[in-house]
Amino acid sequence: MCRISAFFSILLLYFILLTSLTIFRKRVTYKGVFYVFTTFLGIFAGYLCGIFTDIILFSGVSEFNWLFNGINWYSLEVSFSLRLDSLSYLFTLLVLIIGLATNFYVLNYLKYEANEDIFALLINWFMFSMIILVLGNNLFTLFLGWESIGLSSFFLINFWSTRRGTVKSSFKAFFFNKISDVFLFLFLIIVNYITYLNNLNVINIKFFSLFVNFSTMYNFAALCLFLCTLFKSAQLFGHLWLPDSMEAPVPASALIHSATLVSAGIYLLLRFTPLVTLTDIQTAAILIGSLTAAYGGVVSASQTDMKKLLAYSTISHCGFLFVTVGTQFYYASIIYLFLHGLFKASTFFCAGSFIRVAGSQDTRNMGNLSRV
């Protein structure tokens, strides 16, 4: 239990570190920011691996609650609650591994950019937001993390703001994320109305006992949840923002397409598996997921732009993830998501190096890379 408490203390220290470096950015060099973050993230990831036996092998669960009673409206109270279990453990570990690799990659990739320190801070704010999302154990914390990753992704995609295509792409991603946010907000309101609860653990337990009395509300809540994840995880009809987000620097694309933004929707489905089991959302997930997987695979095969090829590949893989959730192979979904995150991040890192050497994103101009 002491080690679990120390984990949350490290997370708090990460927030303090991020806030301090953001405020005093001009007094710290970029390499200073890099060494601070890589050292800290390495310790954080190592410590998380150290409590593997407590979380995975013995299914240990720890909760850290911080209550702020300034706002209390009916059953909805503003409180901050974190929970480390097997699902949030694997997601947090994935974010830390890819985030650590991204920080190393950024050191050389953007060494000639004027605002590389800002980019490093944005990357780490993005990671922190994702960690808050996956550790969140109540409706407020979940929504806070969800909004934070959407806002962070906007600034990451818009990093090269002098490019016209970049600004257009960032606002397009922001627009689709806001649609997802609206459906999530409706979902959370309905869940709170049905259960009069705020804690996610208790809500999932209550779902089974209240289904008979609120079956119609359950189906509407499931529809909102599905539409929310459809736009966030770039499923068919909600995927239009993802290929355009390739205007962002390669490290940002690696994070968006592997461990964070697109996987947030899948995480939400996995966190609310009782609702998925009780409603017809399974059929919708299988149907849309299958169509998305086929569409993404076919379109990616016809792309000559390397980054867009990887973007449509991500769309296809997210479709497969939706199918595994719809068929209730939840453990397969988690394993698939974890491995895909590692694979996709490494693929983007390699693609960034190829683009830098070839001087072009066109795959037709990369035939002589073996000679370099």
Residue ranges and their predicted role:
Residues 1-9, 16-121, 198-215, 240, ...:
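Transmembrane helix-loop-helix hairpins at membrane boundaries of multipass inner-membrane proteins
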Residues 147:
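Short phosphate-coordinating micro-motif centered on Lys-Gly-acidic
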Residues 101-142, 151-372:
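Hydrophobic transmembrane alpha-helices and their helix-loop junctions in integral membrane proteins
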